[in-house]
Amino acid sequence: MPSNKVRTRFAPSPTGYMHVGNLRTALYTYLMAKHEDGTFILRIEDTDQGRYVEGAVDVIYNTLRETGLLWDEGPDIGGPVGPYVQSERMGMFKQYAEQLVAEGKAYYCFCTEERLEALHAEQRANGEMTHYDGCCRDLPEEEVKQRLAAGEPYVIRQKIPKEGVTGFDDVVYGHIEVENSEMDDQILIKTDGMPTYNFANVVDDHLMGITHVIRGSEYLSSTPKYNLLYQAFGWEIPTYIHCPPVMKDAQNKLSMRNGDASYQDLVAKGYLSEAVMNYICLLGWSPKGEYAEQEIFSLEELIKIWSPDGISKSPAIFDPLKLRAINAEYIRRLSPEEFQKKAEPWIDQAVHTPIDKKLLCANLQPRCEVLGEIPEQLDFFDAMPDYDVSLYANKKQKTTPETAREALEALLPLLSDESLDFSDRDTVFNACKAKAEELGKKNGWLLYPLGIALSGKQRTPGGGTDLACMMGRETTLARVNAAIEKLNG
């Protein structure tokens, strides 16, 4: 692989929906590659069959496509260093482990589960951290050959140096060193011949020419072992970028197991994909310089200004109110046509009678923060809810149930006039305004009761004339007449 070109990879496990933290890793990995005009690789790490969820690979594909994180190499489109599904690469890992054995950097371990359990129990009883005691580390070569020939089960362990320190540099956390004596002789190949996650990761990253590894800070403690593997093979160590955890609050990590929202959950609630990605990017990262005060970024803008130097060491708190605010801003920036297209599925959940959707959307868009909250605002269109006439009392509009009846009776002939065009909201509003002037009243005195009569609610997506135009003449007259009857009690 060309050594001067940035190559990054997103390597998810197909275990279900896309966690917010995973999606942030995918985004940062994508931005790192694209900012440097490099290559973004998708690799599926499916070796843990116990956690594999049917259909989860499609969730990964669909989520990345939906969010615009399109990969340059991957399982479906191929590339020069495939296959890009880890389970399809199984044959190569054992030979790399055996190479380390031949060079004296790894060894066959024949310890049984029972021995290891007894060892760890003893260590715990003595107040020690559990660790492997190196029982098979220096077995005579002849004994190893005999035990292998006899078909005795084994794992392959890496020989971690017993003395000295192993250090590494991280873009976010700086230089970190760990005493070698604190590290276990990690398993590289399990008894079933499958590689461990750490080993497969290092081998695959090297063979795929990965230059920058971006992952969660929970992997910081494993990184010295990764480095020892790179050194054992004589391979170039990639640039490490570890990201802080995404927290629900000061004490708890965001976790789908605890019912916290996945990307799919947020979209299902009516958050826009672009808004979610914008917010996720700001979870633990902030732009510098002239962009420091900016909060709304397109993916193209993020590619342009991306720098891993903006990643914080501090845990990022997932703030639902901040996400709402960003989502509301994205909704406001949509064209009326785009908003209607996105809002219609939500409108159709609640409204099954003919209405003027264009006018409804014009009223919804400035007020809407999350699309999923649209249906609950529209329940009065299909059926008039039962309401108390006390709703007609409004100090600001100087209305009472008595004045409301007077206002509705004054509006009835106007709204009944066949020449009044209900498809033109401004025409209807101006006619009502003229009627208010004729009566010597303010607009609200006349139109506030109309809104109550048509909806049975104080808060609606639009005032009285807007609701009348959305519903049309027939429904409007039926509801106004019913309201007058109710007020006559």
Name the predicted role of every residue range.
Residues 83-87, 110, 189-190, 208-219, ...:
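Conserved phosphate-binding loops in nucleotide/dinucleotide-binding enzymes
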Residues 34-46, 199-212, 233-247, 460-466, ...:
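Glycine-rich phosphate/pyrophosphate-binding loops
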Residues 426-488:
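Charged substrate- and nucleic-acid-binding regions of tRNA-handling and nucleotidyl-transfer enzymes
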Residues 20, 266-274, 313-319, 352-360, ...:
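Structural motif
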Residues 336-439:
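Small-residue-rich helix-loop
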Residues 29, 60, 100, 104, ...:
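Residue-level signal for inorganic ion chemistry
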Residues 2-125, 222-235, 275:
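N-terminal Rossmann-like or analogous alpha/beta NTP/dinucleotide-binding catalytic cores
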Residues 102, 107-242, 248-254, 262:
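Active-site cores that bind ATP or allylic diphosphates and position pyrophosphate for catalysis
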